[in-house]
Amino acid sequence: MIIDTTEVQAINSFFRLESLKEVYDIIWMLVPILTLVLGITIGVLVIVWLEREISAGIQQRIGPEYAGPLGILQALADGTKLLFKENLLPSRGDTRLFSIGPSIAVTSILLSYLVIPFGYRLVLADVSIGVFLWIAISSIAPVGLLMSGYGSNNKYSFLGGLRAAAQSISYEIPLTLCVLSISLLSNSSSTVDIVEAQSKYGFWGWNLWRQPIGFIVFLISSLAECERLPFDLPEAEEELVAGYQTEYSGIKFGLFYVASYLNLLVSSLFVTVLYLGGWNLSLPHIALPFFFEINKAGRVFGTIIGIFITLAKTYLFLFIAITTRWTLPRLRMDQLLNLGWKFLLPISLGNLLLTTSSQLLSL
């Protein structure tokens, strides 16, 4: 009887330890995800504030100044306002598609952050097809916009959804061809490998210098994918009121608002990763990675430096995107499609052909 009791106690202790280990593993898995979500949230708030301040400077007016110091809490005030607004549904629309559309758009963009390396060994999912996984995931977002436009039962919303789908298809192909050229140069489709392939010669090792044509095409295609001026035809106020967002209010409208900035941040991060060397300091002949690997404190410091460098390069592209918004006029729909199919697609195909030829000759 004593032996049986001892065995039962040992088994119970073993199961308790196993349960604690499972809980610990779950917590350890959730910590980086929650940290990434917190970082993304802060990044979006900073982008909104920067856009308001830069736009005010370009237009020679005063930007937000009442919501917190220097108006830095303006985005938080806007989000709170949208959160407490009434959530209206169209009486004759498809309420299921109407409600699911914004969620699909936001979720597909959020999943793109899984393959982005923010620093040395700081990525949630280092998969061998990282860049193409991003393209596949981001291709789902236009489906959500089309569902939103169709479910609204509004001609302006439906036309805006159709424009969003057509625009995404037109510019997704040149963007994919540019990414394929980068993969050929790096001999890998992993985002981490692409960054490390640019670290050999510092600043001169960036793909920006080896792929200048691809960089310009990728830049234009990224702006078009984000539906930023001069490519904001799905939301053209003068023609479509607000496009696929016309019938939305409250938190659902806020989701579209967040999705646009999330997409802009994703595009900026991928410009940094694919063309600007990612987390690398970009100074040749300086063995900083070796210095950062000396001890644990060095690794932590190196990770922080890498995150700072990545974000600095990212916000440089964001500044260009925001400045472009107030510099160039909106294109017509035919001009937008002609630019994508008649100019960017042949140029990106030619760039891919040149890259493939150079790689074959170097073998």
UniProtKB/Swiss-Prot annotation:
Chain segments annotated as transmembrane: 30-50, 98-118, 127-147, 253-273, 300-320, 336-356
Listed GO MF terms: NADH dehydrogenase activity; oxidoreductase activity, acting on NAD(P)H, quinone or similar compound as acceptor; quinone binding
Mode of membrane association: Multi-pass membrane protein
Keywords, ordered alphabetically: Chloroplast, Membrane, NAD, NADP, Plastid, Plastoquinone, Quinone, Thylakoid, Translocase, Transmembrane, Transmembrane helix
Compartments reported by the entry: Plastid, Chloroplast thylakoid membrane
Enzyme class: translocase
Xref: Pfam families: NADHdh
Single Gene Ontology BP annotation: aerobic respiration
Gene Ontology CC annotations of this record: chloroplast thylakoid membrane
Catalysed reaction, written as an equation: a plastoquinone + NADH + (n+1) H(+)(in) = a plastoquinol + NAD(+) + n H(+)(out); a plastoquinone + NADPH + (n+1) H(+)(in) = a plastoquinol + NADP(+) + n H(+)(out)
Function summary: NDH shuttles electrons from NAD(P)H:plastoquinone, via FMN and iron-sulfur (Fe-S) centers, to quinones in the photosynthetic chain and possibly in a chloroplast respiratory chain. The immediate electron acceptor for the enzyme in this species is believed to be plastoquinone. Couples the redox reaction to proton translocation, and thus conserves the redox energy in a proton gradient.
Family the UniProt entry places it in: Belongs to the complex I subunit 1 family.
Subunit-structure text: NDH is composed of at least 16 different subunits, 5 of which are encoded in the nucleus.
Protein name, per record: NAD(P)H-quinone oxidoreductase subunit 1, chloroplastic
